Amino acid sequence: MSLITRVLQGNLTRKNALQTLTRCGYSSHAKFAEHRPIEKIRNIGISAHIDSGKTTLTERILFYTGRIAEMHEVRGKDNVGATMDSMELERQRGITIQSAATYTMWKDTNVNIIDTPGHVDFTVEVERALRVLDGAVLVLCAVGGVQSQTLTVNRQMKRYNVPCLAFINKLDRLGSNPYRVLSQMRSKMNHNAAFIQLPIGVESNCKGLVDLVREQAIYFEGENGMDVRLDEIPQDMRVESQERRQELIEHLSNADETFGEFFLEEKPFSEADLRAALRRTCINRTFTPVLVGTALKNKGVQPLLDAVIDYLPNPGEVENLGFIEREGKDPEKIVLNPARDGKDPFVGLAFKLEAGRFGQLTYLRCYQGVLRKGDNIFNARTNKKVRIARLVRLHSSQMEDVNEVYAGDIFALFGVDCASGDTFTTNPKNNLAMESIFVPEPVVSMAIKPNNTKDRDNFSKAIARFTKEDPTFHFFFDNDVKETLVSGMGELHLEIYAQRMEREYGCPVTLGKPKVAFRETLVGPCEFDYLHKKQSGGSGQYARIIGVMEPLPPNQNTLLEFVDETVGTNVPKQFVPGVEKGYREMAERGMLSGHRLSGIKFRLQDGGHHIVDSSELAFMLAAHGAIKEVFQNGSWQILEPIMMVEVTAPEEFQGAVMGHLSKRHGIITGTEGTEGWFTVYAEVPLNDMFGYAGELRSSTQGKGEFTMEYSRYSPCLPDVQDQIVRQYQETQGASQPDKKKKKN
């Protein structure tokens, strides 16, 4: 029976109950909501590949810091589930679907935590969490090592310049090898990384850790590993500890000039010097400290919390920029003031929207100033005013009211009409905005319809809510086939939303077969000179545009660009937006397969206008005509999404697995083997990956598993393109276009 359960059932006296809860570290919400100086604030995320133990680690952190009074498991037998997995679907499936925020305290430092999903289909949750965090804990499985989503998270951290600690988890699992994981971090992720802890035994012999910084052994004893005992390093580990400590010193010396002087001049240095070098290099992203443990067995969590405080930055050590728009000039960069004194105007960034019990909940990070209940703020994008009626801080699905928030705090507001990535400020006149959030393009589409026509209202409400909350979930109606389609990052992504429609809105839906989001692009430049002229009595329509459409480089083949290169007044500037609008409208549907255009630059170079008959509408229609001209005269090809696939299975099935990947047009990029298992890495077209899960199970006797994530768009094979074009033409009731219109 847990301590808190005994308290609730009255098995302890009031005095003993207080002592018991205090020993647990359990504290009231007020303790965590106290205002603290900026040096005592940490904003961290916990990110990793799926099933690496992120949520279990967060549960232990909350317990050891006194935020919760008892621990629950991700797949707990008590039907409670982990604190941060508040959605029923998360608890059923044992996976994290939405990022969840909480805040706690460790050694007088306020730690704001965002636990993120590990599945590639929910990668936007990681993206927007990392955008507003100052540091992160990258969790790696001691068995699985660096996996596909680990690489994705690593790229996201690099994009937002987020310093991180690495925590090699699951030391207790059969086959765990933290030394192999460190080697993968260096080779696959290009991290300058070294252990600052070593395991005392692995698998069933996992007893504790060796701290290489303080040169002591750490053991976790008592109920739930709450008693941390320091001791001498075991005799049989002293040689290895010295070697690994020397390796740590060498890696730090290469990354930090100040510490390098100690090493080169062979000067003695203190533990404080070593810690200072670790902090400097970690914040500068030139070194990654590697810690070890097993969250499930309650080992290594408290030293990880110490490392978060010691080595990850506070909000004042991270430079955050705002941009002030100047008409006709490049935006002016402004460094935001992170001081928690409220002297500067409030600046905050909305990074997540969620429909709560009391209306829309908007998650924000405060970057400058202070925000109090009753204040007015403005959305920098829409210039709409919002009055703050209620301020809350989040503990998973629980909301805790606060009166004010300061720079560095993560909080939420109710009833704010905005989008992810919007900037809010108290001064609407300075046109200040922060850099928004990168949103990947959806790669899979499915037809969707409610099972019962009476549920259409609820279906519409669900779609409206989910598309607003999740920028990677798209909805549209295809007029050609008269189908409603949803697009997302993968089959699981769309299946989860279908299940949520039934659970949360009482609207069961049927999903069709998945469809790949192909794209169409130009093979080479194609010039155009189009005149749109219409006269039917009264004022007519007149617009002429001259220019060229050309392909963008392969690394930009998901973008569409419009460039106004006109000189003089042949195309008046007030009509140029009409040309761009017409271009982007026509880019929604290509000629070969009906898919969107991408990887194209539209260069408007010249044209002509009529003083009476020209208008923005006329130039928009001229753009329509010009693109139809390019459809006919240009050489086109179809692009398809390529996935990075990682398959792990017993060695005896390696030939079968690689054979199946080759049949699916996969290109093998690497293989690894260890202790009877192998891992193969391949790039495979998404169109060829449907049904692979069943094939892998049958060919490996159910022992194989795979993950995949989006890599890039690449031209289709000629026979694949012919098949796609033929299928599209059949649905249009037309014959296949002239072969000259497309190039493979």
Swiss-Prot record:
This is Elongation factor G, mitochondrial. HAMAP family: EF_G_EF_2_B (MF_00054_B). Residues 725-744 are annotated as: Disordered. Residues 39-316 form the tr-type G domain. Pathway: Protein biosynthesis; polypeptide chain elongation. Disulfide bonds: none annotated. Coiled coil: none annotated. This protein may be expected to contain an N-terminal transit peptide but none has been predicted. Transmembrane segments: none annotated. One of its GO terms (molecular function) is GTPase activity. GO terms for biological process: mitochondrial translational elongation. It is found in: Mitochondrion. CDD domains: EF-G (cd01886), EFG_III (cd16262), EFG_mtEFG1_IV (cd01434), mtEFG1_C (cd04097), mtEFG1_II_like (cd04091). Keywords: Elongation factor, GTP-binding, Mitochondrion, Nucleotide-binding, Protein biosynthesis. The gene is mEFG1. The lineage of its organism: Eukaryota, Metazoa, Ecdysozoa, Arthropoda, Hexapoda. It comes from Drosophila pseudoobscura pseudoobscura. Belongs to the TRAFAC class translation factor GTPase superfamily. Classic translation factor GTPase family. EF-G/EF-2 subfamily. Its main location: mitochondrion. PROSITE patterns: G_TR_1, G_TR_2. It comes from the Eukaryota. One of its GO terms (cellular component) is mitochondrion. InterPro entries: EFG_II, EFG_III, EFG_III/V, EFG_IV, EFG_V, EFG_V-like, EFTu-like_2, G_TR_CS. Residues 725-735 have a biased composition (Polar residues). Mitochondrial GTPase that catalyzes the GTP-dependent ribosomal translocation step during translation elongation. During this step, the ribosome changes from the pre-translocational (PRE) to the post-translocational (POST) state as the newly formed A-site-bound peptidyl-tRNA and P-site-bound deacylated tRNA move to the P and E sites, respectively. Catalyzes the coordinated movement of the two tRNA molecules, the mRNA and conformational changes in the ribosome. GTP binds at residues 48-55, 115-119, 169-172.
